[in-house]
């Protein structure tokens, strides 16, 4: 493109120079004009390549680039003069001078115009991407540094807001600190702000809620920087800002990992993750990849989801980690044993499961096959292959279960606790509440309802649930694997349960609406649902806190013969009897545990 443009401008300078001089200047013949044009063109391009003119970025043209251009044009004119003298024993100085001036003006002008247009576009872009940064501490300065390090930053930080009065009226990173949060609204109006970026990674949830409400009043777009844990693990950088989500306003303090202990358990090891294409399984894979395992086996029965997570992880970590994909069903016992024998994983995270309460109420046999039989297959195969640590992803619905899904999870816990008695593998279970943002969870459902204009459906105004984010749940699972000693149930101190109706209201407000514009409708409790969930029952309560925010519950082994008898018989049971026998099996086990305690 540039070469073609320069060719046109060089030839045009010869023609224009001739037209300017023809009435007062006589050439020997038309061949002299042709010789001048060809000589100037060829010598100019040779000089341009010698001086690397075509490797320069002309949108950043400066004095240095113009001097190089001047050298090339002057040298090509000199070469042309020598050729003219060799052929005609004279040089056409007036024509050469005219061509030199016209080339310099036209070619140099296009370079300068390119820069002027680029600067104009950048100024327009900057005018629509001016950001006010909340937080002038280490997080805010780190984020500003990364934003400004880009050649063409998408967002231009223009000022800081910070409640620390000692920083007011100072300049940090060249940006003024103009006041505390009471200055947010005036700053947005005065500085023509388009974005507010909350850059305090350690901000407590209540403080974030208050700050967010203040920012919402301005009417501009609100962003937030990643949490320090995400930056520490390398999953996000300070400059990768994002929209504020319902999870941020949930009231949960993220779990801080013991990265050294996790690294000791995972670095250089072979890790297998079942359900690797699911919400939790895929996030576990992302986070353990930061600890440099030797290889990760991505196991799942959905080819599209497995291909998606493989493509993502191999692109990010493929230079240092070998990723294997295995399309398989955990209900296929022979396949599980074959894969365990093939890879001999050091650590297994068993995330494959059916989790939707209403669906499992209507399909109890499928819940048993996947959550119970599947867990037994994977756990026994891991035991056979000499796996060091086996982590079962369980649920708070396994506590005093009132539905089929919870009962099958409770059953699965009992299976691994019994295996842990006789195996060298450390079997542990991790229990947590509902996961925000996972497929089929309330957040995606509420979002779709809001997009349609409502109503947002909530079962009961008093219904509460414990909630975790997907990254937080995955961190707990990984940390549990690092802490595992065997036959343990890890439970996160999840703080206070959250009212579902409050979560719905927050999401409506985050979407820019009021509850008058998008109403909330109460539909009644569904089959198998409880008004509230528990994390431990009375037989499991244990005083020990093994890690900040992580408690240990006492292992419940259950009555192994009763459990195995159910597994042997369930295929022949009608649906009503299956549900009754399932609950009878786990309740008998609970009674035995309670009796042994007393």
From Swiss-Prot:
It is found in: Cell membrane. The chain crosses the membrane at residues 1-21, 31-51, 63-83, 87-107. InterPro entries: NAD(P)-bd_dom_sf, Polysac_CapD-like, Polysaccharide_Synthase-Rel, SAM-dependent_MTases_sf. The keyword Ubl conjugation does not apply. Keywords: Cell membrane, Exopolysaccharide synthesis, Membrane, Transmembrane, Transmembrane helix. SUPFAM superfamilies: NAD(P)-binding Rossmann-fold domains (SSF51735), S-adenosyl-L-methionine-dependent methyltransferases (SSF53335). One of its GO terms (biological process) is positive regulation of single-species biofilm formation. It comes from the Bacteria. It is a multi-pass membrane protein. The keyword Glycosyltransferase does not apply. Belongs to the polysaccharide synthase family. Involved in biofilm formation. This is Probable polysaccharide biosynthesis protein EpsC. It comes from Bacillus subtilis (strain 168).
